[in-house]
Amino acid sequence: IECVEEMIDKYPEELFKNPELKILDPCCGMGNFHLVIYKRLLNYHNKKHILENMLHFNDINKDRLNILRKVFQADKYKLNITEQDFLTYDEGIKYELIVNNPPYAKLLPNGKRASKNHNLIGVFIEKTLKILKEGGHMIYITPDNWMSYADRNKLIKVLTEKQILHLNIHTAKKYFKKVGSSFTWYVIENKPYYKDIEVEGIWK
């Protein structure tokens, strides 16, 4: 949760005031991102409006969604919950904000993750940009390999052509001490690059 709070702090506060804001977490798990966002939204909107109109949840894990329903009181509020593969997700909505800690490799029929050669980050970001409003924002945490200038890496071009408002390099490692990967997280505005990037941390 501390890592999520740090990330959400970089989202422009005034945008939380918009009552028409629609926020999607496409791999919501048990709702860590939306727990933090919900608390911020309570400064400006009532609970019913937030839960029934502003927050949108999606995941492919039924058990996690059942826990999420209890956390966000699905017995009292009509939550926006879908159980879909995000890559084929289509609710006919353009979102102002999409937050995500995406899976790094495809889930195989045996329940295991595929090798790193089946990295899903690129296709998740491509999908995100398709359903993100122009001028909307995405907040992602991913391994740092998207920053490589390797010939096959097209993701660095896709992301740097957009306006990265904040890029955090490797400092999130303190929250994932038992995980081998090095992480970046970033806040991106869905507009062409127009100003300098705020960078925190060091690329090694």
Locations of regions flagged by a protein language model:
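Class I S-adenosyl-L-methionine
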Residues: 1-76, 85
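Conserved beta-strand segments of alpha/beta enzyme cores
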Residues: 54, 78-80, 165-166
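Short, glycine/charged-enriched secondary-structure capping and boundary segments
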Residues: 38-40, 70-73, 111-115, 153-156
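A short acidic, often aromatic-flanked loop/helix-cap motif at beta-alpha or helix-coil junctions
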Residues: 4-5, 87-90, 172-177, 204
